[in-house]
Amino acid sequence: MRNKVYIGVDFGGTKILTGAMTNEGKIIGEPVKVSTDSNDTSEKIFKKVTDSVEHVIQQIDMKNFEVDGIGMGVTGPIDIRNGVILECPQLPTMHFFPLKRKVKDFFSLPVYMNNDANCLIYGEALYGSGAGLNSVVGFTLGTGIGCAIVMDNKILNGSTDSAAEIWPSPYLDGTIEDYVSGSGVSKIYREICVQEESDSKSSLEIAMLAEKGDTNALKTWDEFGRHLAVAVSWTINLIDPNIIILGGSIANAFKFFSSSMEKNLRKQICPTPAEKTKIVCAKLGPNAGFIGAAALAVNKV
């Protein structure tokens, strides 16, 4: 009897990363990465998806393995139940594209789909920093802020597939995403330095300055940690998870904002989780997205 293997597709706005794994999270073969372009037609993008899946399948020893399903983590917003991309600002030709049905018809395999942020955290919850825990909340910190909730090995989607979408929540003079995101880090730095927007630096540049001991950069990350603590406190007080996982490019600067975040967070949450809830970084690296997507197929969700 052949062992089952599952394909995961991490479908982002600029790239598609596809890989295969077992139900235990062991990666089979080499993941395949292809770039996408905003000028690509929907047909061209769909072909990139199918080509990458086929390339991954070709690496699998079919004498010992059989493909049991495909999971996709897709940039959105998306209609999870029907498997349709509703809107994709970076790939406008994919608006209202029925990706799940198209992939299912092409490969004649079961296909499962969720949004990319959910899948990244799902991978971490099952096989990464949250493995073995039954209640996980994760944040993806990059260009924007994403949030996902995993309970009893299932993603909490909500009645309209919008659970944990905290980015538009009102905060100070705007939304929480205005402060807890890559653009938020740049905004904080500009205000500390009293710079014009044209002189703005990216979060990566500000992290590099902090590495060199730049005072304004260090102040920026300290302030960012204070704002992040607010977002994290909302979810802890509401969900009471075992653990909070931070992923995305900004999490790479964890050492610069962790102290400020922890100090402010513990004051804003209930006493028991204040003592027990851990905040950790994601550990699966760039493969987390396709691992979480493949896990959709493993668990048939």
Where are these regions (language model features)?
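Glycine-rich phosphate-binding loop of actin/hexokinase-like ATP-binding domains
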Residues: A131-S183
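Adenylate-forming
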Residues: L120-L126, I149, S169
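Short clusters of small/polar residues that mark proteolytic maturation junctions
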Residues: V32-K33, Q90, T160
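ATP-binding/phosphotransfer module of carbohydrate and carboxylate kinases, centering on a glycine-rich
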Residues: M1-G69, I78-V84, R101-V111, L126-L133, ...
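Short beta-strand segments
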Residues: D10, G71-T75, N114, G138-G144, ...
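Active-site nucleophile and cofactor-binding loops and adjacent substrate-binding regions
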Residues: Q90-P92, Y112-N118, G138-L141, V280-P286
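A short acidic/small-residue loop/turn micro-motif
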Residues: S35-D37, T93-M94, A163-E165
